[in-house]
A protein has these predicted regions:
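Long, well-ordered alpha-helical segments
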Residues: 196-213, 251-255, 359-369, 390-407
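Active-site recognition of the HExxH zinc-binding catalytic motif
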Residues: 342-368, 389, 394, 432, ...
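A well-structured
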Residues: 1-278, 290
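Glycine- and acidic
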Residues: 122-123, 181-188, 228-234, 269-280, ...
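Post-HExxH zinc-binding segment in Zn-dependent metallohydrolases
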Residues: 242-243, 367-368, 379-407, 416, ...
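Auxiliary, metal-adjacent structural segments of Zn-dependent hydrolase domains
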Residues: 274-334, 347-348
């Protein structure tokens, strides 16, 4: 069914909550392992219509945050979602209390029971009002960001539409584009500072109700991190600082040599080539035709997937006023349909987001069609889900010429560099958030000082050159995740470690790399991050020294492929 034909009905929350009580009773009373497994399948199906309605409302709202009808529907889910989530937790509690709970591990692997334990530890009726308040704060942030329009070059532009100007070869144009963006955020400075103060206090209050010191602890439970915790993430960040940052300095030196920029300032960062960055082919239809060819030639599975996506209008990727910034993939369970949202701005990032979100959507498409996989185990934890997307960016490389033509080699180099450089930025975001929730009384200026301190630690090559907004350390406020889904960022770093390994494997044997990827995808949400890495024969980046060799190989490839 085409997206435009999908009907929306606001769900009956009371009826759903009643159904949840009945399912909890069934889970508690299951008299055998087989019966318990069947109840698990039943409860996972029970939420399909609710989830579909919630996602339809979210899609329509983020596609136009000014639409009063969809704003009201989004408000409805913001207000009622916590009660539904807590009802689901009660079902999990009933499963865990059943004497036959081990049957779920036998049927569905290690993540099922561990995930339910995290759900029980992370939610409680006592936090419902705080959860509602948090959802409302996120919606306020989305309105501030989604409503951003700046006057530039004689036009009214959204934040994503400033992208091409930030890559302009004239440094004055680049800086002016950043200043135009900065002016918008500075105009909303008090609002953004106030929202973040409220978010930190809200989430810390939820954590303390549940017995945690602060939200940085609770986040590991809420993010359903299985098999690792804060100690492993600290080890990872230490390795990035000691083993990756020195290689990244060399990458930056090569880029400066290539571009002829002797002193790198923040507004110079987007420029990767003296004659301009790689540009993808223009036009929605041309790009979609190239994507169809690419995925048809990659594999039979991806051919079926891209036909389904395009034939059913499951892309909204062009930027326009009122549309929320960023990109995402979500699923509409009733229709077994992934949906891709993005903001193209005629830069190479358009191809990044296309292949990235198609990686997510491909995994969702495959999992939704596997009858053995319950709906709530179709997707693994976020650090694992991002492997699907980030690895897909690299595994489609043999077809990038369809999207870049003469700029293909430039894009290959830029993409490898940016993926590698991202590890430093991702660690800044993660360490910053740990510091914020562990020190909730910091003033806005003190928060910004922490951000600048971490920039110097992980990206010492950057000079902010007195740039408004960014120069005072407030650049983190345009990073959606910090407000919308705290601590969902180190996931990108962990998955980048997998994606870089897939890239290096594909250079030796693309067929082997793709088969490993497909094997990983087919495990859906039935395995943890470490198990999925092992499934594909990849190194897990928590062990001391596990990152160094990968960093050196990436540095070497980049040095050998200067354009």
């Amino acid at each position: 069914m085409k997206f435009s034909e999908m009907s929306y009905t606001r769900p009956d929350i009371d009826a759903l909550l009643g159904q949840c009580k009945a399912l909890a009773a069934k889970a508690a009373g299951a008299a055998s392992g087989e019966e318990l497994v069947n109840v698990y399948y039943e409860q996972s199906r029970a939420f399909a219509d609710y989830s579909t309605a919630a996602q339809l409302a979210s899609i329509h709202y983020t596609c136009d945050t000014r639409d009063a009808y969809w704003k009201a529907e989004q408000d409805f889910f913001d207000a009622n979602g916590p009660a539904v989530e807590n009802a689901r937790v009660e079902i999990s509690r009933a499963f865990l209390a059943n004497a036959h709970v081990d049957a779920l591990t036998e049927a569905f692997g290690t993540t099922c029971v561990a995930g339910m334990k995290n759900a029980v530890l992370g939610m409680d009726d006592r936090t419902v009002e705080l959860q509602k308040e948090y959802n409302a704060l996120v919606s306020q942030y989305q309105q501030v960001y989604g409503g951003a329009l700046v006057e530039f070059d004689g036009k009214q532009l959204t934040i994503p539409q400033l992208g091409p100007y930030k890559e302009n070869l004239d440094p004055a144009v680049r800086r002016a584009a950043y200043e135009a963006e900065a002016a918008y955020f500075d105009a909303h400075r008090d609002e953004l500072d106030g929202l973040y103060t409220k978010i930190v206090k809200n989430l810390n209050a939820q954590a303390q109700i549940l017995g945690y010191h602060d939200y940085s602890e609770l986040s590991y439970v809420r993010m359903n991190r299985i098999g690792y915790g804060p100690a492993e993430i600290r080890k990872f960040r230490v390795q990035v600082a000691s083993d990756v940052v020195p290689e990244l300095k060399k990458v930056i030196e090569l880029r400066c040599k290539r571009t002829g920029i002797s002193h790198l300032t923040f507004s110079d960062l987007p420029v990767a080539f003296q004659d301009g960055n790689p540009s993808p082919i223009e036009g929605y239809e041309a790009r979609m035709a190239a994507a169809r060819t690419m995925y048809h030639e990659l594999s039979p599975e991806t051919a079926e997937f891209i036909d389904f996506m395009q034939d059913n209008e499951l892309f909204d990727v062009e930027s326009r006023p009122g549309k929320m910034s960023g990109g995402y993939m979500t699923s509409l369970p009733t229709y077994k349909a992934p949906f891709i949202f993005a903001n193209w701005n005629n830069t190479s990032a358009d191809v990044d987001v296309l292949t990235h979100e198609c990686g997510h959507a491909f995994e969702g498409y495959v999992a939704e069609r596997d009858p053995k996989v319950p709906a709530d185990l179709e997707c693994p934890g976020m650090e694992s889900a991002e492997i699907h997307s980030m690895a897909m960016e690299f595994l489609t490389a043999p077809w990038h010429h369809l999207l870049f033509g003469k700029d293909t080699e430039k894009y290959a180099l830029l993409h490898a560099e940016d993926s590698f450089l991202f590890l430093a930025y991702g660690c800044i975001v993660d360490e910053f958030q740990h510091r914020m929730y562990q020190n909730p009384d910091l003033t806005p200026d003190e928060r910004n000082a922490v951000w600048l301190e971490l920039e110097h630690k992980y990206r010492p090559w950057i000079d902010f050159d007195n740039l408004p907004f960014y120069g005072r350390g407030a650049g983190w406020q345009r990073q959606l995740h910090i407000y919308e889904c705290p601590f969902y960022y180190i996931d990108y770093c962990l998955s980048t470690m997998a994606a870089l390994q897939f890239f290096l494997l594909s250079l030796k044997d693309h067929k082997d790399a793709w088969e490993r990827y497909l094997k990983l995808v087919r495990r859906a949400g039935l395995a943890s991050y470490t198990e999925l890495m092992q499934t594909a024969g990849l190194k897990v980046p928590f062990e001391d020294g596990s990152i160094k060799a990968i960093a050196q190989q990436m540095g070497q490839w980049i040095a050998e492929h200067q354009v």
